[in-house]
Amino acid sequence: MKSIKRVEKVTSHLSDFGQWYTDICLKAELIAYSDVKGFIIYLPYGYALWENIQKYLNYEFQKTGHQNVYFPLVFSEKLFQKEKDHIQGFSPEAAMITSTGQKELFEKLVIRPTSEVLFSQYYAKIISSYRDLPKLYNQFCNVVRWEKATKPFLRGKEFLWQEGHTVHATEKEALDQTLFAIQLYEKLGKELLALPFVCGRKTEKEKFAGALITYSIEALMQDGQALQAGTSHYLGTNFAQSFQIQFQDQDHQNKYVHQTSWGVSTRLIGALIMVHSDDEGLILPPYIAPIQIVIIPLQPKNELVQAEAKKIFDDLKTTYRVHLDLQNKTPGWKFSQYELKGVPLRIEIGARDLAQGEVTIFQRYNNSKNNFSKNTFKAEIPKLLKTIHDKMYQKAQKHLEANRRQASTYQEFKDHLQKKGYVAMSISGMDAEIKIKTETGATARVILETPLITPNCPVTDKKAIQTVLFAKSY
């Protein structure tokens, strides 16, 4: 790829939001396309974002005793069919291996769309007593789901994710674990991604296949469409009964275990791009950015300038993810390149800066430049990074709140949907939900734990039972 291609202007998000998003994914060198639709190549800069999400989660898992494992990519179709609700939910997008070379397989193999059945089969083998509980397992892996419409990070035939699978003696322990996971994801959004989420319980129609309860985190993109960014499921004893996962309690009674599963994926990277970026390219929150600070000597052949740039690099590299750019490119090209890549801070050092005892620091999130004393600027960097993160979160939160409405009539609901964003309405249940999706394209995101807006459902005129947040979504 020629260097000029990496600094071409991206499409304006106002003229074509979808192309703007794709341009950023490609031109910021996050991904490349493979020869099979829906299977992307994660380039180093894009994969580093996922690695930083993994690091954050692993740090949290170490505190709570969750252990990482890795289970196989394939399992038998017979195993897949053991939980009837689960297979009905995933069969349409499950990919199968039916032959090897010229030989047809006696039994089809399922390529992992999710791993509940594999974990359940294993748990049935190793759990027999209350002393074996709880089991707190997690794996980072890839999954394959044969999606029709694909988009980098947001919806692919293959994607990367984290999936937790836990087993407990009681319903309460499992429900607590289900809430722990969704609260962890909310914390991940706030502390690492600068992403505010709406968190809540899914409706019966939208819950995970095979679960009793599903919670989700929902993000709102700049174009007003919602994105489900993570889920946590209480599976009850559904899989335990299908796979006969039983234990003997302290009273010597045989009981079924209670299970949970929960996960986030590379969809978080898609949300990160769509929520924060602008027409110049990526804008990355500093704590997830692969490069937090780039140092650009304005006259790289000037020995004094180069020496000062290297000194700054050496001073910062043990604390931050720093890159010193000594390429034989113009400063303007480098500025555009790192703005496209969303690097939070850029330190510029030139002959004039040296003479004045200063450095210039550019902040990507608001495209501002300020001069700092070269003797004291290092103390300002952690403050700048925190301010950038906080401001990015606040901006996204403000956008979310400004695009959250409620409706008392069905017509008002439709009118609000035209503006995009979230619309809350009290409904009678699944019948109303199905009609809303059919007629407007909006889907239920989460149930709100708030009083009813109206006593009757505006869609069916039946008694309203819950207030639900709706949106059009990716």
Curated annotation (Swiss-Prot):
GO terms for biological process: prolyl-tRNA aminoacylation. The keyword Aminoacyl-tRNA synthetase applies. It is an enzyme of class 6 (ligase). Pfam families: HGTP_anticodon (PF03129), ProRS-C_1 (PF09180), tRNA-synt_2b (PF00587). Transmembrane segments: none annotated. It is found in: Cytoplasm. It catalyses: tRNA(Pro) + L-proline + ATP = L-prolyl-tRNA(Pro) + AMP + diphosphate. Its EC number is 6.1.1.15. Keywords: Aminoacyl-tRNA synthetase, ATP-binding, Cytoplasm, Ligase, Nucleotide-binding, Protein biosynthesis. SMART domains: ProRS-C_1. One of its GO terms (molecular function) is proline-tRNA ligase activity. Its main location: cytoplasm. InterPro entries: aa-tRNA-synt_IIb, aa-tRNA-synth_II, aa-tRNA-synth_II/BPL/LPL, Anticodon-bd, Anticodon-bd_dom_sf, Pro-tRNA-ligase_IIa, Pro-tRNA-ligase_IIa_arc-type, Pro-tRNA_ligase_II_C. One of its GO terms (cellular component) is cytoplasm. Homodimer. Catalyzes the attachment of proline to tRNA(Pro) in a two-step reaction: proline is first activated by ATP to form Pro-AMP and then transferred to the acceptor end of tRNA(Pro). Consists of three domains: the N-terminal catalytic domain, the anticodon-binding domain and the C-terminal extension. Belongs to the class-II aminoacyl-tRNA synthetase family. ProS type 3 subfamily. This is Proline--tRNA ligase. It comes from Phytoplasma australiense.
